């Protein structure tokens, strides 16, 4: 029997033994599962190596042209709605050391029991490889996501799309217990500042500085928000 599909002969078989079905309707035959080689670590994420890098790695030098650091096998490999988290980690650590206290602060008595495990994963499996080779495989980041998901009250970090502030709340506030970067005149403290502004009809495309100034200019007298001191780190949540 000649089996033909769209005028092309694909294979020969006995009569009534050949059938075409959508690939979504087939599954691997479990009888042959034992003959398959065991999967290697990281196999599902491609052949690109992403080794653990212990020790100290300085931030990657700044570049004039971002195209030189873009392209295939550059940055953090995405997996299961990780884009928000990948972009946040890349911007926090690749070219700057302002967040390096997370990597080197010794565990205190008030820290969680798995503090060292989270810190080592962040430093040796994500930050150092980023700074050294500008690539981190998704399974390395998934390890951190799994830790944060189990150690904080922010759930769904392993597969759901979140806002960056939810990730920062899990990592900075709940797990690593980083001192707040901002202290406001109201007495509130925070790790990031949300820019709340009204649209200015006189500005077509506002800069970050425009939005920042306008946000702090909102209100009068005691209701106007001010910074008590210049923050060591300023993370801004932009208006949408």
Regions found by a protein language model. Give the residues of each.
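UBL (ubiquitin/ubiquitin-like) substrate-recognition surfaces
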Residues: 1-240
